[in-house]
């Protein structure tokens, strides 16, 4: 942990003197970006959304092309911290090709209005049916079948949906009413 903190401090000190952008194709630069991302993920998983967001903001400054898709996790952080304005800024950087965006929009709508936005819900059910089934399932086992599927060369959509659930499960334990609202639409 101390190494990560020192590395972060070096990056911050350097960035105060001049603009620093790390090159994705440079091996050591990429390692720094990946380490910063992994640290942000660790903090996200333990519920330290503020530190996760700070690290992801730094990552996006250092890697403006967002090779690691930090915007997605940052949007989850902002929503968890109820930073709606920041969420509104970053959600446009989250690809609509992934279910994450619709889950984020559903959650944001639910937090703001107290109900699920019907347009997003309809798109979620139709376009990302496997994700809808996963997020409304009663159990989400990380069993041998799931592990084999997710580690294969071509993971199934169901395995990817389970992976997203498992990556964000700590959120849904805190905001269970959102998941209950989703389940009520089955």
Show where each model-derived region lies.
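Long, ordered, amphipathic alpha-helical scaffolds
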Residues: 105-186
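Flexible helix-coil transition and linker loops at the boundaries of alpha-helical arrays
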Residues: 2-28, 60-62
